[in-house]
Amino acid sequence: MTERNPILQSLFDRKSVRVYEEKPIPAEMKQAILEAAAQAPSAGCQQLYTILDITDPALKEALAESCDHQPFIAKAPLVLVFCADCKKWYDAYLEAGCTPRTPGVGDLMLAVTDAAIAAQNAVVAAESFGIGSCYIGDIMENCDTQRSLLHLPDYVFPAVMLVFGWPTQQQKDRVKPQRCAMEHIVHENGYRTMDGAELRDTFGYKAGNAPFDQWCTAFCNRKYNSDFSKAVSYTHLRAHETLANL
């Protein structure tokens, strides 16, 4: 493979950072990160998201608790919540005298996608400054609590939360978790269901020296069947129902 250019190298090097130096992010860097997020592609160039810049220390503490009791969230110098926003265009249509339909599941999916793409733009921009980041999936758990904390109206859903900060040396030195081999990620011209042997080959590296079945069962219980996973799945269903029924 040819030598990677700086952008590619940054993408390959990027890993989640959860421990930060006690150093603020300069205002001009923060602004650049936010502006980069807004340059992300979006469905129909609608930018179906709203970014919440969390600066209130008390609110950071509350989010750290509501997002599975993770204190490092409150210590991060920059905390952003990317909301899937189906409200502002709906309100604009009403303002213009239109008779818009009620936002539905498809609108939510587009808005969540827009929010996630914008969030990743912010991550890449931060990496260019040497600023680390971590996605907080727990923002979708306890949705009623999060919506109350963030004063979210109908048709607005907390899709993505990101925390940013200057990584400590220990975080810089930490080995990035391995990714699956490309032949298991890329399918040509259509989806191909993998057989048991391929699945074991795909995820076997994660098991290390443990028997695959033993590792996979433990991982399933800890992740897929966990209370958090069930809560997030329930939250997604409720978000769809809320948009469909309001």
Protein language model annotation of sequence segments:
Residues P6-K23:
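Generic N-terminal amphipathic, Lys/Arg-enriched alpha-helix
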Residues R14, I33-Q39, L80, P103-L149, ...:
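Small-aliphatic-rich amphipathic alpha-helix that forms the alpha element of a beta-alpha
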Residues S42-A43:
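Glycine-rich phosphate/pyrophosphate-binding beta-alpha loops
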Residues Q46-A116:
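Glycine/small-residue-rich phosphate/adenosyl-binding loop
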Residues G132, I136-M194:
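A contiguous pocket-lining binding segment that forms or flanks enzyme active sites
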Residues R192-F203:
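A conserved mid-domain beta-alpha-beta active-site/ligand-binding segment of alpha/beta enzyme cores
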Residues A207-S233:
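C-terminal alpha-helical cap/extension of soluble enzyme domains
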Residues T235-T242:
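Conserved small/polar residues in nucleotide/adenosyl-binding loops
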